[in-house]
Amino acid sequence: MIRGKVFYKGEFVEAGIEVENGRIKRIGKLVEGKEVKGVILPAGIDVHVHLRDFAEKRKETIETGTLSALHGGICLVVDQPNTKPPVDDAETYFRRMGKAEKSVYVDYALNLALTNSNHGKIGSIMRKISERYFVPAVGEVFIQHDSEDLQIDYETLSSVYKRFEGVVFTIHAEDPAYVARGSPNFVFRRREAEVLAVERLVELGKFHFCHISTKDSAKEILNSNSTYEVTPHHMLLSVEDYGRLGNLVNVNPPLREREDVEWLFRNFHRIDVLASDHAPHTLEDKEAGASGFPGVETMYPLFVNLASKGYISFKTLVEKIASNPARIFGFKGYGEIEVGNYANFAVFDLKKVDEIRAERLHSKCGWTPFEGFEAVFPDKVYLRGKELLENEMKAGNVLKKRV
């Protein structure tokens, strides 16, 4: 049992939390417990991470990626299946989950890839996997990708989507007509690529759009029944950072002009999900032009600092990083500090403002685009009532069947 300033039902209250068998039994002013310093927030959910491993384990592994998530106040990550090899069949899915079962510091779920090799049999693949594991979504589906097998055209996506009522499809929306194949440089990935793809896709169905980076795309989705996520780097960095970061700046979709960046941040309350798109590469690979940023460890701390300073509200932050991801992807028992839910929370001392330094982070890639940014990292992280940070305990679970 712990006591402190708990974020409960949309506001902070002085209360205690009693935990039994990993779940919250009671919350109230009369509940006794160990007093903690700072605010007690729901632990975050990052629905978009690329934990590499397999043939790219020199960049990141499931073990190092989930350790990084733990230190960032995240209790559950959703890994993307565009690995090498891609997770587009049951055997590869089971192999990756078996690897995760032995090594995760936080809870772990894995999406299923939609490829040109598997789209005709994805139903049977999904049924086989679902006998053992909970699959949050099909995706991230790439409308544009350097791999011909991973690049799915609109017609194929529409055909598959219509066969799977109730399944979440997550989309990387960049129209291939506007993207130079094989080039990660932002000059060749025009903002029109995202806008055009979103305009077409919202007419085809209800999707969850990954890493939206332009105001026009966001407005289009807001007028539909789809949902979308935005990354910290698309709200806190811009093309102006190219001079500071050099080749490190490469990311898909690319960093945008200040107009888009400022609109997304001003409208943070209107987005559905805050997700990191944690996509680590070594410095050597980045210098060679690889696209992607690490971010699972810095996302929550960056935005806790912004909330502490009044730029955003804690209510909005908790919605975007915890309760909305749980609702959209069906993670029952996650996302809110509430009786019956898992006792997953993070304690942040708002007076402990640090500067982000790569050498203190835990991702295997060894760098961050947010070097020198102010952040508030968690002092304690609880997963099903166990405090994990002090001893870096591997207490995570893989999500089995339906949560």
Swiss-Prot record:
EC code(s) of this entry: 3.5.2.3
UniProt-annotated binding residues for substrate: 50-52, 82, 281
Superkingdom in the source lineage: Archaea
Keywords, ordered alphabetically: Hydrolase, Metal-binding, Pyrimidine biosynthesis, Zinc
UniProt keyword RNA-binding, yes or no: no
NCBIfam families: PRK04250.1, pyrC_multi
Protein name: Dihydroorotase
Organism: Archaeoglobus fulgidus (strain ATCC 49558 / DSM 4304 / JCM 9628 / NBRC 100126 / VC-16)
